[in-house]
């Protein structure tokens, strides 16, 4: 693939707030992506299913999809906002996903560096833990879910286990699988 259009990359650390132990990802992302594309990248990196509304906040700006209604602020079109123009080194963005559950992410720009053609321009470099299941009730609901799953005597244990499935492991994070999905996403970018 020819990545001449990628002059620099952003080194990001993205942390899901109010969840303990922390769920986080460290990514290398082309500085040329829009916030709309970064939304898709974060959905893949965290394992969200893109079933809910989202928005970005930085300074006085609130950005999101043009057809989306914000919660009080006028939204700028995220598809016109390029990461490299919105967020430089040491900048912090706020990424909110699923306003009902209230999943808040902090996106820290750790560095902006020249693109090294020997590395993929888009990759998850590290991370920890599985993302909470969609519609699990936000941080408080997720904590309740984890407590019920951990205690076989909890009256909701069986219902919660049936809901999330036997394969759900809150400690699991498969970096190689996420990178396969990101590579596929980047090919179609």
Go through each PLM region and give its residues.
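Short linear regulatory motifs enriched in tryptophan with gly/pro/ser
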Residues: 1-189
